[in-house]
């Protein structure tokens, strides 16, 4: 099967979040399963800095962006059997970052037009064209409405994956003819219109042959007003083509037996290396080195979506317990300042590291006893899966992908891989936090059993890619 991905980012070339991880891992896993896979990405300046001497210049052409003709340079790099094709235009993509510019609408309108026209020029006409999030959500519309006259495109099946419904690509209706060069008809009849704006995500949902999200629970949640971000009505209408598939993680990278970023390796049969890592982490961040105290790790963006308003609200109560909390992350300045203040107020209990450091992140995943992830909503989440690979038990809000990947501890059966609370409130966060600490202190055997169960869970991309392969096959 020929599968082509189009996305705004993809590891290792460009990455700001979970989307980049997926584009870096899923195509590679599909190649292992015997498929022919290509990926179309923007050629950012950070891509050029890291891979400029490895990419191959193929050719260039021009694409119409409204009334203008814009340069499209095409580069290629084959990595892990995947053919990565890069759209090069320094005006749009040499910005020092991936997102956040005033003209993001124009940048990704250009990218989508270039990606659609590129398929014919590289002679890669896929069986399945898989697009991701709003940045590429207009591609199914373009294939079926603007480029339908190209015979080679008429049998392409399109799939849209929603990684985060909160970001929808809402722009003025004039973009349709000023940038995409299409008529007003589909806006006038309401197909592309939502809240008096052109809505790219709505277009993708309606025009894609199948819509996926990154967990089954999130697929259910976004059909409700609470999580639907004003598109729940459309998603309920299209629920027959909506499916959730949990992301995977790269189990070769996140492997406690071989991880090169760890000083001490371990496995589920011998966790002594985890204790050595815990001692080293406590020493590194300036906390008292104690084996008996539970270490709670946090690696996250500090935002309301990630639940840190709840954490800050309850932090004084949490720090009354015999516990150490090690935080790594940046985000909302108010949360950064709050954690910094608590770090000064409780120097023996809280280490607030307001930065991002890949090595420290790995050490926190591997050395902590508990991993705190109280997200308000979480389409999938990867951190909880990474933590479990290292025998670190997640404490999560029971929502989205967290619900699908973390089995809450059952005191009667001893089964579970972590702890969860259902009601998003400070009371239940604190109650669950204290229950986890109590189990850690009182029942070492039960705790070790939970660690072993967590480390046995299969979060590899092989499982996820098999689900995607079956989905693709069902559409052909």
UniProtKB/Swiss-Prot annotation:
> Which reactions is this enzyme annotated as catalysing?
[(1->4)-alpha-D-glucosyl](n) + ADP-alpha-D-glucose = [(1->4)-alpha-D-glucosyl](n+1) + ADP + H(+)
Residues that bind ADP-alpha-D-glucose, according to the entry? 15
InterPro entries assigned: Glyco_trans_1, GS/SS, Starch_synth_cat_dom
Q: Name one Pfam family in it.
A: Glyco_transf_5
The GO biological-process annotations, alphabetized, read as: glycogen biosynthetic process
Task: Give the Enzyme Commission number.
Answer: 2.4.1.21
Q: Which UniProt keywords apply?
A: Glycogen biosynthesis, Glycosyltransferase, Transferase
Task: Tell me which CDD domains the record gives.
Answer: GT5_Glycogen_synthase_DULL1-like
EC supergroup of this enzyme: transferase
Q: Under the GO molecular function aspect, what terms does this record hold?
A: alpha-1,4-glucan glucosyltransferase (ADP-glucose donor) activity; alpha-1,4-glucan glucosyltransferase (UDP-glucose donor) activity
Task: Relate the protein's function as given in its record.
Answer: Synthesizes alpha-1,4-glucan chains using ADP-glucose.
Q: Which family does it belong to?
A: Belongs to the glycosyltransferase 1 family. Bacterial/plant glycogen synthase subfamily.
Q: Can you name this protein?
A: Glycogen synthase
- Gene source species: Streptococcus sanguinis (strain SK36)
């Amino acid at each position: 099967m020929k599968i082509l991905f189009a996305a705004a980012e993809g590891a290792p070339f460009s990455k700001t979040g979970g989307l980049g991880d997926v584009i870096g891992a899923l195509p590679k896993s599909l190649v292992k399963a015997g498929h022919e896979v290509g990926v179309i990405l923007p050629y950012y300046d950070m891509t050029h800095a890291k891979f400029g001497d490895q990419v191959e210049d193929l050719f260039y052409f021009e694409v119409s962006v409204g009334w203008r003709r814009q340069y499209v340079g095409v580069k290629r790099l084959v990595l892990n059997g995947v053919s990565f094709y890069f759209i090069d235009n320094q005006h749009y993509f040499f910005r020092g970052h991936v997102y956040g510019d005033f003209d993001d609408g124009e940048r990704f309108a250009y990218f989508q037009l270039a990606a659609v026209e590129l398929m014919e020029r590289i002679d890669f006409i896929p069986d399945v064209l898989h697009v991701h999030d709003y940045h590429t959500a207009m591609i199914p519309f373009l294939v079926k409405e603007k480029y339908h006259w190209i015979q080679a495109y008429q049998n392409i099946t399109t799939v849209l994956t929603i990684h985060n419904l909160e970001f929808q690509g809402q722009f003025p209706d004039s973009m349709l003819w000023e940038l995409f060069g299409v008529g007003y008809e589909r806006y006038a009849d309401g197909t592309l219109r939502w809240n008096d704006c052109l809505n790219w995500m709505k277009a993708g949902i309606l025009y894609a042959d199948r819509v996926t999200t990154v967990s089954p629970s999130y697929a259910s949640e976004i059909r409700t007003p609470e999580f639907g971000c004003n598109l729940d009505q459309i998603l309920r209408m299209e629920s027959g083509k909506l499916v959730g598939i949990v992301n995977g993680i790269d189990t070769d990278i996140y492997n406690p037996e071989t991880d090169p970023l760890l000083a001490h390796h371990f496995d589920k049969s011998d966790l002594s290396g985890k204790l050595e890592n815990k001692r080293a982490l406590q020493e590194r961040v300036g906390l008292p080195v104690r084996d008996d105290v539970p270490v709670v790790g946090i690696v996250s963006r500090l935002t309301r979506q990630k639940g840190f308003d709840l954490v800050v609200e309850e932090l004084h109560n949490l720090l009354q317990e015999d516990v150490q909390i090690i935080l790594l992350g940046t985000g909302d300045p108010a949360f950064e300042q709050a954690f910094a203040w608590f770090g000064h107020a409780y120097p023996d209990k809280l280490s607030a590291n307001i930065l991002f450091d890949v090595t420290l992140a790995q050490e926190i995943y591997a050395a902590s006893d508990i991993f705190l992830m109280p997200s308000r909503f979480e389409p999938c989440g990867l951190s909880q899966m990474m933590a479990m690979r290292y025998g670190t038990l997640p404490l999560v809000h029971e929502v989205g992908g967290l619900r699908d990947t973390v089995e809450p501890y059952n005191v009667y059966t001893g089964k579970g891989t972590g702890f969860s609370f259902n009601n998003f409130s400070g009371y239940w966060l604190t109650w669950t936090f204290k229950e986890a600490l109590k189990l850690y202190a009182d029942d070492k055997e039960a705790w070790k059993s939970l660690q072993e169960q967590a480390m046995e869970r299969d979060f590899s991309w092989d499982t996820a890619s098999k689900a995607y392969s079956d989905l693709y096959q069902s559409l052909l």
